[in-house]
Amino acid sequence: DSDCKDKLPACGEYRGSFCKLEKVKSNCEKTCGVKC
């Protein structure tokens, strides 16, 4: 969890069009297991 937050501080809080950016989406899902 802490490692995840270090890499993606906003992980789990992505919303709207920002979440649709493929790199952000895939990084969030791969690193944190969070679905955008």
Swiss-Prot record:
Main location: secreted
Disulfide bonds: C4-C36, C11-C28, C19-C32
Residue ranges constituting the ShKT domain according to the UniProt record: 4-36
Superkingdom of this protein's organism: Eukaryota
GO molecular function: potassium channel regulator activity; toxin activity
Biological processes annotated in GO: killing of cells of another organism
Location(s) in or outside the cell: Secreted; Nematocyst
Keywords noted in UniProt: Cytolysis, Disulfide bond, Hemolysis, Ion channel impairing toxin, Nematocyst, Neurotoxin, Potassium channel impairing toxin, Secreted, Toxin, Voltage-gated potassium channel impairing toxin
Assigned GO CC terms: extracellular region; nematocyst
Similarity section: Belongs to the sea anemone type 1 potassium channel toxin family. Type 1b subfamily.
Function: Has hemolytic activity. Inhibits voltage-gated potassium channels (Kv1/KCNA).
Protein name: U-metritoxin-Msn1a
Organism whose genome encodes this protein: Metridium senile
Lineage: Eukaryota, Metazoa, Cnidaria, Anthozoa, Hexacorallia
